[in-house]
Structures are given as structure tokens and as C-alpha cells.
UniProtKB/Swiss-Prot annotation:
The keyword Transport applies. One of its GO terms (cellular component) is TRAPPIII protein complex. InterPro entries: NO_sig/Golgi_transp_ligand-bd, TRAPP-I_su5, TRAPP_component. SUPFAM superfamilies: Ligand-binding domain in the NO signalling and Golgi transport (SSF111126). It is found in: Golgi apparatus, cis-Golgi network; Endoplasmic reticulum. This is Trafficking protein particle complex subunit 5. It comes from Gallus gallus (Chicken). Keywords: Endoplasmic reticulum, ER-Golgi transport, Golgi apparatus, Transport. Belongs to the TRAPP small subunits family. BET3 subfamily.
Length: 188
């Protein structure tokens, strides 16, 4: 009788607390995110306002995501260098959100404070059908707001924007003080 309730999996109370399963059904995520976009779309008048609203909501998620991830992944230790925090975003943050790492992390050739996180097929754009009049809409603005919050709460203030290039590219532009601090840490 007991096996009928557990269905071959370990019982809920016997699972370890340190690493809870964070799996969410893809169809449930798609439905919730589509409804979130529709909700925001009804309350704004332009694509720029819609992307700003999605970024604000992503910012709220990012603030709540950082602390549990740092405590699980790093044992409570925060990053102090720009490259290590970007690798944290590309790896553990992306895996917690989308189940895989981001496709690429690149630095701009001409600017030492600009980095790019490239995702060829972002999950947030997969289930959204965009009308012709809103063809510039990129729902990855939600992810950009989330990454901006994670970086800001980690002590690396930056402006993060989503662009269509090689799929979707998040452009991360750090403040001057962050780069100056990183260079002074390298000198030690």
C-alpha cells in the first residue's frame, strides 16, 4: 500500500535537505511565464515598457535566488572577482533557472567593462509568439533583470540588457568602480 504513494521514488521526508530537487515541469513553466508576459502586456503601452516591466520582475526573482544558491553552491562564500562572478552566473545560476549552463561567456574586444552571456535558444523566448507590431520584443529582458539583480546583490553593480544576436545575448556593462576594484585585486 505504501508503494502506491511513493511510485518507486524515495519518500519526500527521506530526501536530503542540502540539495532539494528544483525541477519544474516545462509545460508549467511555459504556462506561468506566458501568463506573466500577458499580464505585463495588458498594463503597458509600448514594447520598451513591457521589457522594462519584465526586467523589474526578473530583478525581484534574482534578489530571492542569490542567497539560497550561494549557500548551496559555495558554502556561503561570495565571489570577489568579476570573472568568477560571471562564471557563477553562467554556471550555477543558469543551471538553477534553466537546467543547463549558458552557451557562451565572452568579453567585448574594445571595452574591458562589457561582457556577453550568449544563449542560442533561451527558454523564456521559446513559448512566446510575438505579433508583428511587437517584433522587437525580447522576453529575455526578464533574464536580464534577474542577472542584474544577482550581480548587484553580489557587489558587482552593472547594467544588463537583452539583445537579439546569435540567439539572445545579455550585454553586461559593469560600473567603473567594479573594474577598478578588480584590477586592484589582481595586483595583489
Amino acid at each position: 500500500m505504501e508503494s502506491r504513494f511513493t511510485r518507486g521514488k524515495s519518500p519526500l521526508l527521506e530526501r536530503p535537505l542540502g540539495r532539494p530537487r528544483g525541477e519544474v515541469s516545462l509545460s508549467a513553466f511555459a504556462l506561468l511565464f506566458c501568463e506573466l508576459v500577458q499580464y505585463c502586456q495588458r498594463r503597458v503601452y509600448s514594447v520598451a515598457e513591457l521589457q522594462s516591466k519584465l526586467a523589474q520582475l526578473g530583478h525581484q526573482v534574482g534578489l530571492r535566488l542569490l542567497d539560497p544558491l550561494v549557500s548551496r553552491e559555495r558554502g556561503g562564500r561570495r565571489e570577489t572577482k568579476v570573472l568568477s562572478v560571471l562564471l557563477f552566473v553562467k554556471g550555477p545560476v543558469w543551471r538553477a533557472l534553466f537546467g543547463k549552463e549558458a552557451d557562451k561567456l565572452e568579453q567585448a574586444n574594445d571595452d574591458d567593462k562589457t561582457y556577453y552571456v550568449i544563449e542560442r535558444e533561451p527558454l523564456v523566448n521559446t513559448f512566446i509568439s510575438v505579433p508583428r507590431e511587437n517584433s522587437t520584443l525580447n522576453c529575455a529582458a526578464f533574464t536580464a533583470g534577474l542577472v542584474e539583480a544577482v550581480l548587484g546583490a553580489s557587489g558587482f553593480p552593472a547594467k544588463v540588457t537583452a539583445h537579439w544576436h546569435k540567439g539572445t545575448t545579455l550585454m553586461i556593462k559593469f560600473e567603473e568602480g567594479v573594474i577598478a576594484r578588480d584590477k586592484s585585486l589582481e595586483g595583489r
